[in-house]
Amino acid sequence: MSLPDQADDAQQPLLSSPPSEDDAGRSVKPTRNVEDTVLPETATLGRTLSWTSAYILVISRIIGSGIFATPGAIVKATGSVGLALLLWVGGAFISGCSLIVGLEYGCMLPRSGGEKVYLEFTYRYPRFFASTLVAVQAVLLGFTASNCIVFGEYVLFGLRIEPSEFTQKALALGLLTAITIVHGCFLKTGIWIQNVLGWVKVGLVMFMGLTGLYVVLFHVRTAEHAAALEKLSWDGLWKDSNWGWGTLSTALFKVSYSYTGMQNLNNVLNEVKNPVRTLKTVAPASLLTACFLYLLVNIAYFAVVPLDEVKESGQLIAALFFEKVFGWNFGRTVLPLAIAISAAGNVMVVTFTLVRITSARIFSD
């Protein structure tokens, strides 16, 4: 041992404790190496998202206003009930393939940021190019202003208030402002509210599906009801099917849009308890739940509403369903408020996650 080393040892106190692992971790300065992204991080406020909150964060992002509007357009394009249902299953399969990639990256890189982290890790040069693209997309294209407008429109329609452009935008701005304040100042309260809205949304879709099954099994038989049930037989399922590739691809795009949001949890993994284990179970459970509910609601639509009316309904198939089951007055009130709740829940979870993506981009520099 050299004399300088001996002098350094002599200056150390005899009763000093050895440095702990925590002290060692705090003494390590963060580097700009991309390999550091494989290390898990914990958010400043801790890991506040339980399994249930994580599940709602995903399923509430997936189930939006699409299930109330797109089934009619898909049946009109495909021509038959069976082919339409097949496309809903096919959309779930395609989303599952995409989900596998998200699970692989999420378990390997359990940090908030989602695609920003994954693209930075995969495409390292030019530096910050991938993260800048993700930031631009998140800021300019990723927000959910359209759902805010939908919320304002359907609240006014459901409450039977004469709509105007000012009142619609005022409600939209009020919703967005309230959600921003809640998520910014009251983290746990915001999570609780979006959990409640998410469960209300799931319960509403389940209620619609079970209502359709109840009508099929216990409602008084009429000629219109018999015609609706006939199209659910094996021969009726595939009648007038349109197998054109152009038609199927367009309809499949519409179906795939209804499954958007499967990787929503990947954006907030810093705040999830047991992130890897939670991600492995929440993502597949959300995919199976969405596929099951979509099929159930579609069957309810086809069992209650005549096929010709379904094809001509455009984006109003849910309105026809509620009108057939509950009557015009009740359906006209319940349906718009249901869509408004769906839109509000979607805005809450999108706001919650997009803020994390933006902050991940800012604090990575």
Say what each PLM segment does.
Residues 168-229, 260, 283-287:
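Membrane-interface loop-to-helix entry segments
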Residues 93-97, 201-213, 280-307:
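Selective recognition of specific alpha-helical transmembrane segments in multi-pass small-molecule
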Residues 125-135, 165-168, 275-286, 333, ...:
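Membrane-interface alpha-helices at helix entry/exit sites of multi-pass transporters
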Residues 1-80, 95-96, 100:
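Membrane-interface "cap" regions at the ends of multi-pass membrane proteins
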Residues 67-86, 150-170, 185-194, 215-226, ...:
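Membrane-lumen (extracellular) interface motif
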